């Protein structure tokens, strides 16, 4: 009869005659419902079956092949693979895996390579040397060879019943490590107190597309006491998160160009500080600068902007420096007036408040901010700070005068963010903070 005919069939995986499987294992990924990789349970209510009259004509998988594949995958996910989950803990809809067939430990492709014991670095050359050293130590510690293999895969569950392989790649370990190092060497920026480092892929996605939400977090107060603290964090919709994490992973592993749509989202948000609190906006600016540097490197426009001299002849870059200088002068006034008070941290400067207008009409907006500074702030800060401000503004304007007059008020390119960040970082270096002793 029909049932006995189908008991044995050609396994389309192994190419051998075997007992075919009607129902394949489910729940391959823990906490992911009953999602199946292979499912053919549609005797009625199906959408489209093409030319097939029954489900067995589409494919047949033998019992041995099915058990080997599903058990190996289940073991990889639980034991050997480097997992990066996307979604809530109770239902992780997407799982990224990275493993070596010989069981050797590999670096996490979704994370930056870091040396936990290293001091924060401020010089790009020191950062790249540390990156090379970290990679060499990792290879030595885990006995990695150039001929070893790295396998990357991602699994996505659109529903609780269906699981799909959305990405699969096999590359040599030499290529894999080179691309990990190349990404971290160029998609990086000054991250405040952490020094120069590359943002994680999830951090980039959250900065580009996350909405700001409030979260209650327990923080330690003293040796034994804890307190509830309300903080703002960036949280991205799961569907958006899954899509763009996949794009970034493809770019990082395959050595592709940094996605232009993600870069555009980052730079637009970096020009909208009013939508975020101070801490989250700074994270977005840092991520935008890292992404911009990587994109310029990928498209052969640059890629080593952190090593730029402050007198670089670029209009947008110099306007960014000017923005940071005006912000610094006003912050100096707030620090003096509200020293140690919450008002010092909460007050937003005019330079940041007008940043959108500044990007569209830099020259006229500069005049407006500078006028506010002269009338309300410069006379109330330390003399050496006022002298430093006037000196820097004079230097920057002398460079800008070298450009045609009709270009001075044209909209700025994204490079103004880099000029702003590099000048702001220069204000907080030891060299700059000690300059006042000489100027006094």
Predicted regions and their residues:
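Extended alpha-helical scaffolding segments
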Residues: 1, 18-440
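Protease-labile, long low-complexity intrinsically disordered regions enriched in Pro/Ser/Thr
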Residues: 8, 17-18
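Short metal-coordination and nucleic-acid-contact micro-motifs, chiefly zinc-binding Cys/His arrays
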Residues: 3-9
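Short Cys/His-rich metal-coordination motifs, predominantly Zn2+-binding knuckles/fingers
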Residues: 14
């Amino acid at each position: 009869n029909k049932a006995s005919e189908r008991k044995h069939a050609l396994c389309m995986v192994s190419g051998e005659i075997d007992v075919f499987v009607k129902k394949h294992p489910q729940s391959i990924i823990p906490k992911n419902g009953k999602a199946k990789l292979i499912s053919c349970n549609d005797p009625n209510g199906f959408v489209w079956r093409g030319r097939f009259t029954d489900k067995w004509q589409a494919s047949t998988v033998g019992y041995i092949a099915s058990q080997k594949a599903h058990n190996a995958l289940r073991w990889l996910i639980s034991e050997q693979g480097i997992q990066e989950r996307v979604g809530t803990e109770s239902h992780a809809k997407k799982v990224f895996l990275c493993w070596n067939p010989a069981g050797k430990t590999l670096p996490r492709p979704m994370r930056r390579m870091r040396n936990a014991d290293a001091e924060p670095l401020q010089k790009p050359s020191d950062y790249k040397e540390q990156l090379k050293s970290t990679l060499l130590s990792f290879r030595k510690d885990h006995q990695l060879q150039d001929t070893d293999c790295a396998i990357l895969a991602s699994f996505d569950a659109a529903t609780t019943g269906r699981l799909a392989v959305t990405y699969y790649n096999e590359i040599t370990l030499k290529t894999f490590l080179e691309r990990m190092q190349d990404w971290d060497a160029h998609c990086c920026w000054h991250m405040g107190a952490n020094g120069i480092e590359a943002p994680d892929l999830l951090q980039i996605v959250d900065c580009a597309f996350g909405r700001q939400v409030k979260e209650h977090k327990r923080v330690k107060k003293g040796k034994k006491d804890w307190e509830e603290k309300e903080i703002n964090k960036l949280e991205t919709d799961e569907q958006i998160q899954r899509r763009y994490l996949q794009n970034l992973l493809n770019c990082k592993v395959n050595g592709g160009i940094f996605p232009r749509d993600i870069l555009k989202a980052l730079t637009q948000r970096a020009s909208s500080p009013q939508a975020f609190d101070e801490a989250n906006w700074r994270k977005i600016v840092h991520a935008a600068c890292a992404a911009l540097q990587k994109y310029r490197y990928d498209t052969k426009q640059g890629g080593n902007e952190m090593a730029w001299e402050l007198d670089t002849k670029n209009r947008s870059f110099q306007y960014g420096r000017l923005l940071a200088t005006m912000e610094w002068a006003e912050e100096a006034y707030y620090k003096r007036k509200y020293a140690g008070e919450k008002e010092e941290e909460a007050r937003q400067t005019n330079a940041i408040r007008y940043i959108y207008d500044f990007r569209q009409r830099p020259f006229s907006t500069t005049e407006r901010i500078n006028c506010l500074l002269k009338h309300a702030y410069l006379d109330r800060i330390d003399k050496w700070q006022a002298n430093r401000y006037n000196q820097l503004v004079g230097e920057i304007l002398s460079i800008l005068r070298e450009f045609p007059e009709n270009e001075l008020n044209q909209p700025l390119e994204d490079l103004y963010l880099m000029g702003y960040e590099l000048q702001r970082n220069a204000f907080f270096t030891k060299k700059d903070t000690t300059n006042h002793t000489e100027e006094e």
